Amino acid sequence: MNQDRIKDRILRRALRLWGYNELESENSFDPIVGLLLSAIASELERLGFALESSNSRMIERILELLFPENISGVHPAYSLVQVEPQDDNPSLSLYDSFKTTKNIVNIFNPSENTLKDIYFSPTIETQLHKAKVEYIAFGNDLNKIESYFFTERIGRANRPLKSGELWLGIRCFKEKNIENLQFYIDINNSYQKEFFFYHLKQAKIYFGDKEMQFEEGYNVELKNIDLEGIISKNYHYLSQIYSEINDFYKPYFFTLKEKISLAEQTEKPIIFRENFPEHQLSDAEDIIWLKLEFSEMLTSEVFQNVSFNLNCFPIVNIKNTRLFRRMSGKLDIVSIQSDDHFLDLDYVKNDEGDRLDLKNDNQRINVVLRRGGVARFDQRNASELLQYLLELIKDESAAFSSIGGDMTRETLRSIQQNVAALEQLSKEKNFVQASNPYLVISSANGDTLSCDISYWLTTGEEGNDIKPGTNLEIDNSKSLSFSKAVMLKSSFGGRKSLSVQDKILEYRSSMLSRGRIVTAADIKNFGNKHFKQTISGIEIKKGTKKEVSNKGGFTRTIDIYITRNQSSQPPLSETEWQYLCDSFLLYLEKNSANIYPYRLINK
């Protein structure tokens, strides 16, 4: 309620109490009455604003207590990378680091750009090979794969290959024996995607006359449920992120389980005896040829959109940072200062290498991670108080100006200019969201010890939209050496901490569905929470679709129709939109109680 309306209501109430007609004007009374009413109305208006601010802070604090950090906190971006290792049979480490540089545009000054280092690390400790898929043959064509983005035809068959037959030529640079060969397989036609991957799982793969075991997934075992970590670790947010990313990319990875060797390839493959008899590749001795037999329904029109790649793995926008501190006394506080966002604690070790952050009843040293305030209900930190001070000075400038005098006016003008500059700086630095975490280390005996503190940082949404084909610099790899690292997909999925409005939406969704997705209303509720302002409507209907298999008929489906909001801010790229759609369907398949398949249809 604004000041004029409050003043009008007070005046009408006063007229009734004084026995006057309510239609009497304010000018009918002494001017002091109008001044008093204006002063009271102004203070009541300010009281109303203060009450609304108090309610808002209470709601925000309650939501912060209700939601854990993995729901409301910052989330890193992720992508895929392909490397060319220089060693034989190397294994990745989660601490390997890749770096690129991104140009960050200052929205307050578009002519001023900032170069920021964006770091990525693997999400899985997969095994790599010093090998490369260099040739692919199907139909009438023999193609050379220059890179993930470019393929060149180098031969034409005298007699076309059988329908549904595809050959891969893998160049082995040093390795004579290859085991657990992991392929990343992708198709750049969304309409053929479901059709191709269904038949890929039914395909047979041969090395010579021997049929090989070809399975979906990575060449290392995934630990989706780490029981030991759940029991002993206090902080495992990053493990959940690893699991989420690995599950997202798992359908695109296939592993050749058995060992293959160049020594077993004693004669020319049949492809060079019957289809390309005069091609020079028939004499190459460092290429292993694999034959894949698909259904005859897969023709060259499908195969020309398919790519097979080695030495690919998911990466996530995180950077490992270590801090060494010497502690003394029974209580010590270590602040974690960084320009990037704190994501998760890795470990805290003493001089002997013992983990201090693990749960252990016999341990006399406790380590607790705190974020923001120290468990107070009123958690207004310095940044919030500064924002309040800025608003207060601006609101009270009129009261100071009543003192009069040139000196006073100049002083107030200087204060206002400084406040405006400080406010602009706080917006540019995103100071309102500053919340530096810190470690509270307590010791029962107060002994002096040295601590090795390792933690993970991320740039959040700034890690999004790193373009495909970007060359990554090897920043930190103690056990591996790479000659090249190239990003295959745009990075996406990074976000900043949820706003109060987003937290309210999350809370409402949790209260309505209670974490279950059973009814159409649950699906619609989850869709609104997942897509947020990027869609303008969602509708759930029953439908049918033709099965992909040859012998299958029609099956029932649950069709989800979404209307994309073209005016959403900030605008989404096609890669980010596709990620939202794919992750939405993946979550429904894993958490929904419905037995019918889902179809997502854009209106």
Model-derived features: where do they sit?
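Intrinsically disordered, low-complexity, polar/charged repeat-rich segments
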Residues: M1-K603
